[in-house]
Amino acid sequence: ATHFTHWFQPLTGVTAEKHDSFISPAPDGRVIMEFSGKELIKGEPDASSFPSGGLRATFEARGYTAWDPTSYAFIKGNTLCIPTAFCSYGGEALDKKTPLLRSMQALNKQAMRILKLFGNEDVKCVRTSVGPEQEYFLVDKEMYEKRKDLKFTGRTLFGAKPPKGQEMDDHYFGVIKPRVAEYMADLNEELWKLGILAKTEHNEVAPAQHELAPIYSTTNIATDHNQITMEIMQKVAAKHGLVCLLHEKPFAGVNGSG
């Protein structure tokens, strides 16, 4: 890796990152590659253009990223990605990770209290786990380019009803088409490289709808992995001349993605 980034999840619905190189100037005019503990623990991205839910005025632009040591760092290309929380100067949460970590902490505290009331004095910690299934649609890129509603909104806004509705049960768990199987194989390989344990894949109910299910893991790690998964799904689809639609209801009259 030549760069690092504090990888965080602002209130935009997607992840954010700013890449900094490991290059630092040496006293003799040369450069060295180094990475300090300060750079690992904290970053200061400009937060003025991120949504804040009305917590602060735009001119109060300073935001901080803080390392989340409970989630694994990963390498994407030539960049070391460090999962972080994102907060304002006053400590208000500006992301989706901070409330999640706080809720996990609160649940741990109250669950331990209840367990000890029932006489379990040996418990040290209560951890929650999640295994989010990711449903998605695959559309041929040439067909996708002809639909401006799909390009701009990620879903269709007009069109005729499908010839069949909920009767399309023959697609559910059906034989996976070769082109889709190749996509799934490449997707699995890319996910496994990053330590994301993709386990199950199959056709879903609607035409061109499919599902990927990972092995359960700790809640905040599973959430980070799901964000990475959605990003990689779209990148791998492009390599196969496909477009991966992650909108929960891209087509009227057929099943959406749950």
Where would I find each of the regions flagged by the language model?
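Short secondary-structure boundary/hinge segments and terminal tails
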Residues: 14-15, 43, 208-209, 254-255
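Glycine-rich, acidic/polar active-site loops that bind/position phosphate-bearing ligands
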Residues: 62-246, 255-258
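Flexible, active-site-adjacent loop/turn segments at secondary-structure boundaries
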Residues: 20-21, 156, 249
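Active-site core of metal-dependent hydrolases
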Residues: 1-62
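Active-site-proximal loop/turn and secondary-structure-junction residues that shape catalytic pockets
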Residues: 8-12, 38-39, 86, 142, ...
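A cross-family glycoside hydrolase active-site/sugar-binding cleft signature
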Residues: 5-7, 34-35, 213-215, 245-247
